[in-house]
Curated annotation (Swiss-Prot):
Protein name: Translation initiation factor eIF2B subunit alpha
Primary subcellular site in the record, as a coarse category: cytoplasm
Keyword Protein biosynthesis applies: yes
InterPro entries from the UniProt entry: eIF2B_alpha/beta/delta, elF-2B_alpha_N, IF-2B-related, IF_2B-like_C, NagB/RpiA_transferase-like
């Protein structure tokens, strides 16, 4: 019953606030678990978290984002001095965990603003930018650049099969950003007039590649053939300890929603995401700065030390 209320709370966070990322909703939900916890040992608390994370991954939200956010939340929150862990009163340990969790979430909430500020370094006036799919951090980055006085023209792919690009198109138009909506199959045609590709990521892999909305790899391959830089805007909470080398290496739970997997007929289904290898990416723009794709593995090591 408690777990059902937690999952309901998670869904509510995303449904009531369209601007909230799956990653942020995940860590806020795990904080609720921590606040309610009456665990008396580290193992008992970890078991509580693991059960909730497993339930979150069975929702139809991005399993990639849930996995990475939960892993980093657990890692950051559960660091505690050995002397404190040896005490009989585990409530003091939980209090420290709660304090660290709130600090972690505060940093996550400020991630997009840091990315937007960093990304300005790569914009020029009268720049043509191409973006694919609906990424909240990419949208905020473009709007921030527009408000800062950059004159940009944004080309947005439809991003089928759910046409999520149309949401980006409408949002940019509403905010006065010159925007053109193009067919996914038109990317090769328009690329010759594009100065930069800007995409988000559901997950940044240990390889330095990204998992993102289906069609992203097509856009990035075409961009490289035209010598157009590809910038990935992604919070470090989306860094994942996975090492795919090709499409076949993507975990099944990343490729398909749970409801699709449960139908047990994946041969008839299209994957939601694809993998773009690091050689097709120029920079990963994050809340800790811009980095080359090959630096992601080192950054992950720092996070988990």
């Amino acid at each position: 019953m408690v777990q059902e209320s937690i999952i309901s709370s998670f869904r509510g966070k995303l449904e009531n606030d369209p601007s909230k990322s799956t990653s942020l909703a995940t860590v806020e939900t795990l904080l609720e678990v921590l606040d309610r916890s009456r665990a008396t040992t580290v193992a008992e608390f970890q078991n509580e978290l693991n059960q909730v994370v497993a339930a979150l991954e069975k929702t139809d939200y991005s399993s990639t984002s849930i996995r990475s956010a939960a892993d980093l939340f657990t890692r950051f929150t559960s660091l505690a001095p050995a002397a404190l862990l040896d005490q009989e009163d585990f409530s003091q340990v939980l209090d420290l965990y709660r304090q660290r969790a709130r600090s972690f979430i505060k940093n996550v909430r400020g991630s997009r603003a840091k990315i937007s500020k960093c990304a300005r370094l790569f914009f020029t006036h009268h720049m043509n930018i191409l973006t694919h799919s609906y990424s909240k951090v990419v949208l905020e980055t473009i709007l921030d650049a527009h408000k800062s006085g950059y004159h940009l023209h944004v080309w947005v792919t439809e991003s089928q099969p759910d046409a999520s690009g149309k949401l980006v198109f409408e949002e940019l138009k509403k905010n006065g950003v010159p925007t053109t909506l193009v067919l996914d199959s038109c990317v090769g045609y328009v690329m010759e007039r594009i100065q930069a590709v800007l995409v988000g990521a559901e997950g940044v892999m240990e390889t330095g590649g990204i998992i993102n909305k289906i069609g992203t790899v097509n856009v990035c391959i075409i961009a490289k053939s035209r010598h157009v830089p590809v910038y990935v805007c992604a919070e470090t909470i989306k860094f994942v300890r996975e090492f795919p080398l090709n499409q076949a290496d993507i975990p099944q739970e990343f490729k398909y929603r749970t409801s699709v997997i449960e139908r047990n007929n994946l041969e008839l289904e299209h994957p939601d995401v694809d993998y773009t290898a690091p050689e097709f990416l120029t920079l990963i723009i994050t809340d800790v700065g811009a980095m080359k794709p090959e630096a992601v593995g080192e950054e992950l090591i720092k996070m988990y030390i």
